[in-house]
């Protein structure tokens, strides 16, 4: 039946927030009952989005919206025509026809009142307060509701924090998303959680600041742009040159940086955009340079030639934490970037080195046989008697004749492993590197930066890719008769987390941060009670923190990239230097803030000498600038008003996967350069997986774009996104297959509020979230329920309603007292959960109050008060209006941090209290706090009895009647005592209303025999209910139910009697427990008696029926 809302005419019937929606059916929604997108689903695009569309696309969109609007108007007119026909039919049936003339006037008036235009929001100029329709739309439309509010919030400076405010500060910095394309669902989770926190704190009286920023993402961005240039122009970055390539990256940043910020706005993120930053903007670059110079001057940054993790695809060093290891048990073929055929791993290859002077040979084994081209020694254990005769001898390299000293090293060599002889390649193995330093061996690098054999590897192999050289070396060894075979070997293989390339240890000069001291300080503030200034949520990550920082190594911060912060170091080449290569002399480096400063410092360092300065071409690790983020976003190194007011920040919210990448480095840098721990609490959110628990991957096609969930997208639209991306054509095919399987019908429009609420409610799922889009769809349907609840309230409140200045719950009807009491409890529980960072519990508490208490119970319970103008309910009606308004107004404020758009729109529609200046927006209202005189445990206890009774009545109805039957039935309540009897009698109206009963007769034990044709259900030990369904009773089914009940009672009785019959029972069991057991047994026997009589009653009814 349609919902009719007339301005002056009385509503015929209103049905909303039906209690028939069960918990399970709501939480497991199906796509079949999704709302069809109508004109209300269209929206006005933001200016930033318009820039992305062409004029032709805008014109097409405009025509589409106009067409949709015409369709909606026609639909509304058709509904109005149908409604008038129903009205006339009802009047004819009821004999309430009015004279034709009068009816004609009335129908014209009603038709004008239901003008479809009244249900459509007028267009709102960008940045102005949203202009709402005079009548609420018949259905919730996320696109319509979410339109216009954000631009108004932003233009009104509602997100802006004041550095001069006297309010206590609360500060969060947004983990800056990479400028590599669009936001993903993980960013949406971050935004949903952080915006929930910041809106809650803002409403709780804090000077709340949430700082936005975008990260330049050195390696990630360079990889993306390199792929784009290769795809578009067939060129590498080396082909286009550094200067041109960097220009291309800036173009990419300017294009996609705006997209990311637009998406954050669509997510409702209440970020202070006046403080927006980019990690390579002028102020952040100044901070990076200052940090590098200060740390260098203090001796914490230094340059050294060390073995590094080298990525041959990226041609750069990467840090230890960017290496992912896989365990290989035996011979395994793996796909390696840049190689057509899979490469063998998990083999231990043995070969012989001939000894100088014809003394024989030594056999060595390796998993990387190609590295023998760079061998410079063979190590044995000094105490190994087998090789005593080889001390001080040499082996000869079979390919180049190089003499390899046989050295004794008791640290590296295990005489009981293999042959007891170990080949040493100092330039390409961490352990061998240490041996090379101990024995002053030659370090021979055999690889080019892109992973090919260089001239040091010999002319027969030079130019070969390293894994092709592996095969060639084995063949060459076989030809010389030196190959001794290969066998399976367990090993750990290091892969780059970004490119999946096999890491090659390479000897390179790099810049490092000495982390020993600052790492210890960062550890102490999290684990020592006397210095504890940092807390992790969940607490389990404290152990992870300890593990990382107790084993911390110096941080390699230089990268051989073109995109990023150039290292502020210059090399001075002196005129007198014999070696002119940059970096040849380690003491010729000068670190300074500018080139002029460097020149001045070099002039002082090399007094009277001529020199040329060359800036280091390398850039800094992205995490270096990110590690300064809490400092740099507030103006550091300058002592700004923001820095004084807002540093240190309050909370860091991020994913646990970057605990060491980012969190540890921020703590180390913040303490060293800012003087304090940069935040006092770190909340680690779970990592999002797909519904099957798989990691989201573009190549699998299971990556979810938050905008596609908000706006909805067809399967074809999902495919199009893949085609426009950077995936290899083969990967596109696989990804499309994954999309067909996961999203056969695309993704329905869910809206921002539903997506946010779903993501926050998922946070209780340990360290991983298995995101099911159907759950988001369910919360979108719930938004429709909230919408209908307010529509119902607006009609019942009426145009002239004025909310009360004060409220006295004790004078209100029972259901009103109850809804305020449970609301009070929900408020307290929500605040406690938010304080504890238990966001899922907070969301579920709010959801449960709205869904199961306000909509399912309270709205249904007060409907009799509004059924006509019955003077009997005049007082109750007024009280119900007040409780309805206060519940809605408070409930919307409680929900707002989680669902900002729908709560703002619904709150703005509520009438304001008279003579009270209303806040402009719900987001700057006070967050609800518990009110002492609202709590009423007695009322809640009695309502528990009422609802338990209703539940039993509904169960009886469901078991006895077909689902489509909804007639009111007579019922009886059999009470064991006066207290129960009084409760049921006092709340007869609520029970009859909620259980849809025609009557409810309350009787005490022994006063009433159950009527024929009735079925019984036990509410509790003191209350049983009967539902009378004439002719619908299945006596055999009823008897089976009673037999099962008697069987359960028999088990309870036997268990209790067995315990009470123990010989020592009377002596050893305390008197109070014996008394309790005796009472339990008495009640069981009483129940026995009752159900035996019920069985006899049903048998008699069956017999009488048969006799008739």
Swiss-Prot record:
ATP binds at residue 698. Residues 1032-1064 form a coiled coil. Its main location: mitochondrion. The keyword Disulfide bond does not apply. Residues 1-46 form a transit peptide. One of its GO terms (biological process) is embryo development ending in seed dormancy. Its EC number is 6.1.1.9. HAMAP family: Val_tRNA_synth_type1 (MF_02004). Belongs to the class-I aminoacyl-tRNA synthetase family. A motif ('HIGH' region) lies at residues 177-187. It catalyses: tRNA(Val) + L-valine + ATP = L-valyl-tRNA(Val) + AMP + diphosphate. It is found in: Mitochondrion; Cytoplasm, Cytosol. Required for embryo development and seed viability. Residues 57-93 have a biased composition (Basic and acidic residues). GO terms for cellular component: chloroplast; cytosol; extracellular region; mitochondrion. SUPFAM superfamilies: Anticodon-binding domain of a subclass of class I aminoacyl-tRNA synthetases, Nucleotidylyl transferase, ValRS/IleRS/LeuRS editing domain. This is Valine--tRNA ligase, mitochondrial 1. GO terms for molecular function: aminoacyl-tRNA deacylase activity; ATP binding; valine-tRNA ligase activity. Residues 57-138 are annotated as: Disordered. A motif ('KMSKS' region) lies at residues 695-699. The keyword ATP-binding applies. Keywords: Aminoacyl-tRNA synthetase, ATP-binding, Coiled coil, Cytoplasm, Developmental protein, Ligase, Mitochondrion, Nucleotide-binding, Protein biosynthesis, Transit peptide.
């Amino acid at each position: 039946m349609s919902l009719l809302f007339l301005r002056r005419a009385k509503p015929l019937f209103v049905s909303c927030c039906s209690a028939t929606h069960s918990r399970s059916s709501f939480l497991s929604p199906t796509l079949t009952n999704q709302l069809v997108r109508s004109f209300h689903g269209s929206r006005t695009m933001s200016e930033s989005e318009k820039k992305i569309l062409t004029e032709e696309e805008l014109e097409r969109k405009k025509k589409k919206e106009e067409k949709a609007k015409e369709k909606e108007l026609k639909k509304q007119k058709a509904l109005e025509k149908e409604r008038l026909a129903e009205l006339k039919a009802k009047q004819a049936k009821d004999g309430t026809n009015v004279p034709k003339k009068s009816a004609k006037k009335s129908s014209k008036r009603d038709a004008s009142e239901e003008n479809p235009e009244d249900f459509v929001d007028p267009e709102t100029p960008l940045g102005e307060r949203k202009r709402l329709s005079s009548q609420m739309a018949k259905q919730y439309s996320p696109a319509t509701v979410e339109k216009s509010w954000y631009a108004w919030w932003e233009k009104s400076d509602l997100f802006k924090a004041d550095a001069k405010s006297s309010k206590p500060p609360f500060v969060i910095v947004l983990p800056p998303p990479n400028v590599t394309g669009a936001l993903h669902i993980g960013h949406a989770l971050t935004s949903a959680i952080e915006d929930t926190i910041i809106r809650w704190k803002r409403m709780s009286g804090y000077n709340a600041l949430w700082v936005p920023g975008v990260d330049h993402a050195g390696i990630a961005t360079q990889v993306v742009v390199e792929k784009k240039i290769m795809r578009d122009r067939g060129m590498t970055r080396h082909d286009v040159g550094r200067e041109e390539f960097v220009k291309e990256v800036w173009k990419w940043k300017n294009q996609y940086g705006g997209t990311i910020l637009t998406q954050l706005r669509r997510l409702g993120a209440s970020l202070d955009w006046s403080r927006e930053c980019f990690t390579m903007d002028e102020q952040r670059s100044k901070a990076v340079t200052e940090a590098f110079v200060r740390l260098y001057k203090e001796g914490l940054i230094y340059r050294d030639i060390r073995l590094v993790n080298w990525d041959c695809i990226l041609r750069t060093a990467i840090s230890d934490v960017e290496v992912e290891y896989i365990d290989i048990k035996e011979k395994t073929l793996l796909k390696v970037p840049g190689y057509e055929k899979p490469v063998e791993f998990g083999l231990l290859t043995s070969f012989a080195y001939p000894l100088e002077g014809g003394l024989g040979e030594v056999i060595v084994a390796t998993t990387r046989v190609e590295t023998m081209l760079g061998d410079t020694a063979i190590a044995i254990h000094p105490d190994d008697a087998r090789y005593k005769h080889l001390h001080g001898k040499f082996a000869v390299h079979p390919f180049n004749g190089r003499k390899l000293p046989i050295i004794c090293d008791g640290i590296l060599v295990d005489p009981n492993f293999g042959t007891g002889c170990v080949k040493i390649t100092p330039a390409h193995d961490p352990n061998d590197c240490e041996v090379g330093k101990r024995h002053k061996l030659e370090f021979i690098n055999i690889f080019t930066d892109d992973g090919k054999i260089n001239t040091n590897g010999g002319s027969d192999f030079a130019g070969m890719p390293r894994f092709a050289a592996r095969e060639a070396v084995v063949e060459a060894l076989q030809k010389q008769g030196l190959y001794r075979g290969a066998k399976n070997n367990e090993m750990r293989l290091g892969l780059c987390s970004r490119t999946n390339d096999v890491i090659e240890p390479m000897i390179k000069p790099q810049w490092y941060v000495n982390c020993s001291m600052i790492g210890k300080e960062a550890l102490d503030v999290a684990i020592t009670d006397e210095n504890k200034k940092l807390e992790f949520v969940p607490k389990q990550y404290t152990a992870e923190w300890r593990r990382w920082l107790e084993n911390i190594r110096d941080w390699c911060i230089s990268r051989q990239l073109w995109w990023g912060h150039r290292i502020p170091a210059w090399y001075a080449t002196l005129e007198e230097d014999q070696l002119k290569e940059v970096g040849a002399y380690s003491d010729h480096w000068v670190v300074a803030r500018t080139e002029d400063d460097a020149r001045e410092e070099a002039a002082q360092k090399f007094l009277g000498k001529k020199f040329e300065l060359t800036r280091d071409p390398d850039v800094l690790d992205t995490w270096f600038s990110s590690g300064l983020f809490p400092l740099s976003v507030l103006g550091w190194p300058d002592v700004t008003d923001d820095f004084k007011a807002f540093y240190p920040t309050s909370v860091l919210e991020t994913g646990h996967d970057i605990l060491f990448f980012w969190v540890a480095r921020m703590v180390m840098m913040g303490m060293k350069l800012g003087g304090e721990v940069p935040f006092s609490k770190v909340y680690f959110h779970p990592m999002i997986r797909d519904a099957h628990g798989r990691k989201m991957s573009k190549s699998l096609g299971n990556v979810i774009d938050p905008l596609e969930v908000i706006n909805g997208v067809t399967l074809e639209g999902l495919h199009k996104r893949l085609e426009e991306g950077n995936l290899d054509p083969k990967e596109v095919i696989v990804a499309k297959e994954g999309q067909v399987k996961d999203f056969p019908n695309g993704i329905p429009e869910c809206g921002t509020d539903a997506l946010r609420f779903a993501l926050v409610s998922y946070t209780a799922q340990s360290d991983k979230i298995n995101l099911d889009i159907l759950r988001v769809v369910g919360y979108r349907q719930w938004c429709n329920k909230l919408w209908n609840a307010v529509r119902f309230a607006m009609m019942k409140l009426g145009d002239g309603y004025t909310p009360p200045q004060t409220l006295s719950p004790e004078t209100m009807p029972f259901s009103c007292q109850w809804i305020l009491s449970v609301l009070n409890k929900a408020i307290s529980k929500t605040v406690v959960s938010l304080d504890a960072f238990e966001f899922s519990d907070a969301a579920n508490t709010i959801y449960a109050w709205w869904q199961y208490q306000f909509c399912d119970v309270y709205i249904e319970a007060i409907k009799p008060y509004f059924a006509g103008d019955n003077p009997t309910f005049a007082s109750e009606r007024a009280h119900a209006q007040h409780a309805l308004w206060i519940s809605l107004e408070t409930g919307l404020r409680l929900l707002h941090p989680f669902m900002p758009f729908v709560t703002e729109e619904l709150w703005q529609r509520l009438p304001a209290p008279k003579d009270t200046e209303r806040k402009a927006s719900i987001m700057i209202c006070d967050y609800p706090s518990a009110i002492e005189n609202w709590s009423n445990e007695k009322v809640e206890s009695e309502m528990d009895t009422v609802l338990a009774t209703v539940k039993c009545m509904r169960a009886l109805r469901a078991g006895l009647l077909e689902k489509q039957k909804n007639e009111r039935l007579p019922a009886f309540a059999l009470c064991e005592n006066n207290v129960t009897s009084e409760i049921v009698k006092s709340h007869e109206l609520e029970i009859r209303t909620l259980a849809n009963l025609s009557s409810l007769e309350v009787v005490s034990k022994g006063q009433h025999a159950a009527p024929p044709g009735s079925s019984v259900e036990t509410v509790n030990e003191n209350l049983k209910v009967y539902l009378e369904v004439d002719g619908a009773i299945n006596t055999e089914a009823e008897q089976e139910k009673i037999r099962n009940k008697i069987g359960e009672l028999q088990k309870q009785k036997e268990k209790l009697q067995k315990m009470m019959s123990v010989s020592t029972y009377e002596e050893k069991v305390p008197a109070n427990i014996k008394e309790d057991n005796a009472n339990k047994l008495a009640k069981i026997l009483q129940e026995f008696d009752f159900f035996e009589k019920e069985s006899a009653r049903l048998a008699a009814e069956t017999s009488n029926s048969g006799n008739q």
